[in-house]
Amino acid sequence: CKAVKANAGFGIPTVKPWDAGTIAEKMALVRATGAFAVAMDIDAAGLPFLKNLNPPAGSKTVEELRGIIADAKVPFIIKGVMTARGAQKAVEAGASAIVISNHGGRVLDQVPATAEVLPEIAEAVNGRCKILVDGGIRTGVDVFKALALGADAVLIARPFVNAIYGAGAQGVQVYVDKL
């Protein structure tokens, strides 16, 4: 949240699926940043300690999500959707967008690739919210394929991290030019 606030709300803070009280605290922090949207992971994948909290963090019901989304007061993005049923529940809860994500394939390596589930999810959503997708997007061709399969936009992280660590701003520019 500090980085988003320091950049006049440019950025989308992402919260974990904590208990209701912690989420309310996090939403207050998000509102203070001036962020134009907020995201929440729909699961605690890769963070097993979250499930050991009392009360445990993790999956939320449609009703719980409705309350969280209403409290956010900015467009709300649900990340980690991997099924048509999950996408329909996100829409029912009032999400502005979903992110089809298997958390980079390194945390949930037993689940399908995002490109495999994207067409079915796009059909289920049927334009009722924006569909973002991540996971394995590395080239302009990958971006094109994701858009052709039903995504409204793609998210790319690891290649940008590698580019900035390898060559700073110039590395990022080279990567963008190659896209």
Regions found by a protein language model. Give the residues of each.
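N-terminal capping/small domains of soluble enzymes
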Residues: C1-D19
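Internal helix-turn-beta structural module
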Residues: D152, G166-L179
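Alpha/beta enzyme core
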Residues: N7, W18-V133, G140-I164
